[in-house]
Amino acid sequence: KIAIDAIRASKASHYFYSPDKNGRMTVYRTSGNPYGHIILRGGDKGPNFDATSVEQACQKLAEFNLPQRLIVDFSHANCQKQHRKQLDVAKDICEQIKSGKNYVAGIMAESFIEEGNQPMDDIHSLHYGQSITDPCLGWNDTTTMLDMLADAVKARS
C-alpha cells in the first residue's frame, strides 16, 4: 500500500520552494513522474518474488488503475542475502515469464566482474573487479542468468 501510494503521489504535479541558480528562493512546479513502479525486494516476512506475491502486487496496482508491471530484485531479502541464491530467484522468475505472465517489467541483480565482496580495510590490497559493498554474482553466473532470462522471454513470445 505504501509503495502504491508513493507511485500515485509521484504521478501528480507538485510545487516546492528552493533556491535558483542565483540563490533567490523560487517556487518550482514539477510535471509529475508517470514512470513510478514497484520493486519487490523481499522484507521482514521473507522473499516476495514467487508467482503468488507478484500476482498479488499486480492486483493491488490494478485496483488503482496503475500498470500491472513491476521490477523484481533478485538480491537482498529475496535471496536471503546469499548472493548465489539470486540464480534460484532467476529460475523462478523465468518460469513465471515462460508461463505467459507479463507482470515482470525488469529485474535487479547484484553483479560484478568477480564473485563475492571484500572489506575495504586496506585500499591498497583491494582485488580489482570485486564489490566493496554487497556480495555479487560473478561475470560467468551473470551471463548465465541473463541467458536464462532471454530464453524465458523468447519462450513466452
List where the protein language model places each region.
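Active-site-facing alpha/beta catalytic cores
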Residues: 1-49, 53, 76-77, 81, ...
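Conserved active-site beta-strand-loop modules that form the wall/rim of enzyme catalytic pockets
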Residues: 36-37, 68-70
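Catalytic-site microenvironment of enzymes
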Residues: 59-63
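Conserved, mostly hydrophobic/aromatic
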Residues: 72, 138
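Acidic, Ser/Thr-rich peripheral helices and adjacent loops at domain boundaries
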Residues: 118-136
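Nucleotide/phosphate-binding sheet-loop regions of phosphoryl- and nucleotidyl-transfer enzymes
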Residues: 148
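Generic C-terminal helix-cap and adjacent flexible tail
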Residues: 151-157
